[in-house]
């Protein structure tokens, strides 16, 4: 999957670890949405 920035990673992409994975159809079982606002397409999820 494509890495994405969780809320817990920091305010922006630069210099932060992207600990989430972008899912287009929602988070799979056992994962949770880790970003409160956005991304515009899909969900940023982590285990």
From Swiss-Prot:
Molecular function via GO: sodium channel regulator activity; toxin activity
Pfam families assigned to the protein according to its UniProt record, in alphabetical order: Toxin_4
InterPro entries: Anenome_toxin, Myo_ane_neurotoxin_sf
Main localization of the protein described in the UniProt heading: secreted
SUPFAM superfamilies: Defensin-like
Keywords annotated in UniProt: Cardiotoxin, Disulfide bond, Ion channel impairing toxin, Neurotoxin, Secreted, Toxin, Voltage-gated sodium channel impairing toxin
Superkingdom field: Eukaryota
Tissues/organs with expression: Expressed in ectodermal glands. Not expressed in nematocytes.
Biological processes, Gene Ontology terms: regulation of signal transduction
Spans through the membrane: none
Keyword Secreted: yes
Disulphide-bonded residues: 4-44, 6-34, 27-45
Localization annotation: Secreted
GO cellular component, as recorded: extracellular region
Primary role: Modifies current passing through the fast sodium channel (Nav) in neuroblastoma cells, leading to delayed and incomplete inactivation. Produces a positive inotropic effect in mammalian heart muscle. Paralyzes the shore crab (C.maenas) by tetanic contractions after intramuscular injection.
Recorded family membership: Belongs to the sea anemone sodium channel inhibitory toxin family. Type I subfamily.
Official protein name in the record: Delta-actitoxin-Ael1d
Source organism of this protein record: Anthopleura elegantissima (Green aggregating anemone)
């Amino acid at each position: 999957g494509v890495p994405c920035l969780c809320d817990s990673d920091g305010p922006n992409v630069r210099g932060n670890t992207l600990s989430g994975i972008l899912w287009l159809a929602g988070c799979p079982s056992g994962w949770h949405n880790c970003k409160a606002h956005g991304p515009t397409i899909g969900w940023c999820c982590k285990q």
